[in-house]
Regions:
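P-loop NTPase Walker
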Residues: 1-100, 455
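Conserved helicase NTPase motor core
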Residues: 2-19, 23-28, 187-286, 305, ...
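Helicase P-loop NTPase motor core
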Residues: 26-27, 33-39, 297-299, 305-390, ...
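Conserved P-loop NTPase-based nucleic-acid remodeling module centered on helicase motor cores
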Residues: 56, 61-153, 397
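Conserved two-lobed SF2 helicase motor
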Residues: 79-82, 216, 224, 391-399
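Coupling/switch/interface segments within P-loop NTPase motor domains and analogous charged loops
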Residues: 107-208
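Conserved RecA-like helicase ATPase core segment
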Residues: 250-340, 484
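Conserved helicase C-terminal RecA-like lobe
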Residues: 401-467, 475-476, 484
Length: 490
């Protein structure tokens, strides 16, 4: 009989991880492979067999929801917290207190920059207009306001891009001086304009924080790490476990490294580089794929059995994402069979598609506004739910859907467009300036995001598209994996 955790028997791959005593262990866990059960099994083994006091175990997850869920499943007095809660606890233990801004404060400042702060600053308005290839500056403010009003959706996407740039700048421990170095490395007009705009936003953001007496979450992580380096108190942890490690940023790594250096704790991190989709929050996939570069005496183990998807789907999705050589190679397996799990649906009649699918359905979209074109008097949308006839369907962005699953999944608007899938604005090469990762494959994160969309289903995934505007991802699936694809016309 295998090792039993919460009434479930672990498979051989999961058992091997639970019993491993490496100093630094990376667990590569595929989608739907039971990684949470493995984490619980590991903690149970450390407490019951290795006799480690639960107070000396630190478990980190990325959301309050996931930490609360893990606490309930463990039923032990273990520190289970987010990185932000960890940083706060370190600072409070050392009698250091700050006022912390809301998590969306940077987004707010960036939005205000484009829609208010910029007014009255003609040179900055000219700079922004030039970035969008507009060079007529008679009555600059009037021209700028008209441009923003007419191109609201595009401006909204560029707001996200500038937020992402500044977020990566801070999470990768760059500073104001870095802008000088960046300018030496780029020569194209548009990229230099982007840097100039980003610099203005960065200065405004930092001044806003200072004038309001605030620090942001990234500053707080750095303060916690500096407190430890300067001899501050830190609980004597013997074992650290981090879930969703593929979403860790460089400064979070620096914080963990400072704790390990002070306590000599062992560490196990769990995640899936195929599902590294939060670069806009500062995550650095290099920490995952080059784990041995950052942690000494390291070892890699994999969980390659998946319990959610069919073999046909997981094989197709896996080969698709591994086109990028930067990803860790895996041979994902499943005992489930489904001959044609990927349905490419030509047309935009969501109503008809909802009528023909049996079972529960989750609806996904790449962009928040994708749902609008599918709504009518019979299909309504509110608070992440679509109502059709007497049924209600959950509807999320692909980012929001990570970790979720459903019998069947519909992905909207998988077309070749600036705001399609892949989203061509988000995948801007200038982000490489503020990234420590060497992952330079075109649309690498969009490719991983598409993988996440494909693997939410337990049965079939339906890609709603336009046969005259096929996404490059759909074209690739048809070319390379036609055996597992069915094309529907509605």
């Amino acid at each position: 009989m295998g090792y039993i955790v919460n009434g479930y028997t672990l498979d051989s791959e999961q058992e091997r991880i639970v019993f491993d005593n490496s100093k630094s262990l990376l667990v590569v866990a595929g989608a739907g492979s039971g990684k949470t059960l493995t984490i619980i099994g590991k903690i149970k083994y450390l407490v019951d067999e290795c006799l480690i006091n639960p107070n000396n175990i630190l478990c980190i997850s990325f959301t309050n929801e996931s930490t609360n869920s893990l606490k309930q499943k463990l039923g032990l007095n273990i520190d289970v917290m987010t990185f932000h809660k960890l940083a706060i606890s370190i600072l409070e233990c050392n009698n250091i207190y700050f006022n912390i801004c809301s998590s969306d404060y940077l987004d707010y400042v960036v939005h205000e920059f484009f829609h208010g702060i910029i007014y009255g600053y003609k040179n900055i308005m000219k700079m922004v207009l030039s970035y969008f290839d507009i060079f007529f500056y008679i009555d600059v403010e009037k021209r700028y306001k008209r441009f923003v009003s007419k191109n609201y959706k595009e401006i909204m996407e560029y707001e996200k891009l500038f937020s992402k740039f500044i977020k990566l700048l801070k999470t990768n421990n760059y500073s104001l001086k870095s802008f000088i170095e960046f300018k030496k490395r780029i020569f194209f007009r548009k990229e230099r304009l982007f840097l100039s705009i980003a610099l203005n936003i960065f200065l405004i953001y930092q001044n806003e924080l200072k004038s309001c007496g605030l620090i942001d979450f990234d500053d707080m992580i750095i303060q916690a790490r500096d407190t430890i380096l300067n001899g501050g108190f830190i609980k004597q942890y013997k074992y650290i476990i981090i879930d969703e490690f593929q979403d860790t940023s460089y400064i979070r790594y620096l914080l963990i490294k400072s704790i390990i250096d002070k306590t000599d704790a062992n560490i196990m991190v769990v995640g899936d580089d195929f599902q590294s989709i939060y670069k806009f929050t500062g995550c650095d996939i290099d920490l995952f794929v080059n784990f041995d570069k950052y942690f000494q005496d390291s070892k890699i183990l994999k969980i390659q059995n998946t319990y959610r998807n069919s073999q046909e789907l997981i094989q197709t999705a896996g080969l698709f994402v591994m086109k990028n050589d930067f990803q860790i190679k895996k041979n994902l397996t499943s005992s489930k069979k489904n001959f044609k799990p990927i349905k490419i649906v030509n047309g935009d009649n969501l109503e008809k598609l909802l009528n023909i699918i049996d079972g529960n359905i989750m609806i996904l979209m790449r962009n928040n506004f994708d749902i609008k074109k599918y709504l009518n008097k019979n299909i309504t949308y509110s608070h992440n739910q679509i109502k059709f006839k007497n049924k209600t369907f959950n509807c999320y962005t692909v980012h929001r859907s990570k970790g979720l699953e459903e019998d069947n999944v519909i992905v909207l608007n998988v077309v070749n467009d600036k705001f399609g899938f892949p989203n061509k604005i988000v995948d801007n090469k200038i982000m490489r300036l503020v990234s420590r990762s060497r992952d330079n494959y075109d649309f690498s994160e969009e490719r991983r995001l598409f993988y996440v969309a494909l693997t939410r289903t337990k049965n079939n995934v339906y890609l709603l598209t336009d046969k005259y505007k096929y996404s490059i991802f759909i074209k690739e699936l048809i070319r390379d994996h036609n055996n597992y694809i069915e094309i529907l016309n509605i």
